């Protein structure tokens, strides 16, 4: 189920990330509450200091609530890298994540969230916002994505979050983002960490659930994939853009979170098969329940 971060979550982030021990990691979040003027239903705490090199190190904690008081997503972030408006995914021209950066990220993740495992890594570059536009900077880095695992199996990571189709003004059915831990190690050894939308596994609904055979999953996918992308395929074919047509190059069995049918405030961690696009390693073209073969829309979260 979705939960809120506590001081016990913030403390290991601070201990792992600050290069100089931070003296004021909160024991009581309420005592450090600072209203966020941009959102009446949220609060924020912040800790910052300069390290030995004079670089500012900053830890932020945000928690958002619906107007009825129900917790929404929260996030803990740390940054001692050069400040950028955002980081964007790189492409094949910027290479693979470095081994040193991966070791740094794995070490931080082990200290911050031991129940998480590495799900994906790529190269990234910083973006700076000017008065007129957002432009890429010369600074690049390695990005690593960690997701919660269960019994040694991580939940797969895709670029589509369950808030993709959300109506931001509809607080009653507001979706909770998938839990994820991002760690970016830039090429100057700066670190950016973001852990968002914490969840807690509260129990097991079904032990030793029987999964459909892979042959049955392939039969279902063979029926559904052509139907789902028929119009897009015809569009690309008509314009001789065969290079962009849908091709599956990876099929993965993992866990994902789906909303409970009986209680929308609760979620289930279920085994699924994902069929990934050859043109984008983070795009799942189809997600199928490994239990009953139903299709799961990652944009809706069920």
Predicted segments — roles?
Residues 68-95, 178-183, 187-212, 283-302:
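A short, surface-exposed interaction/processing loop segment used at functional sites
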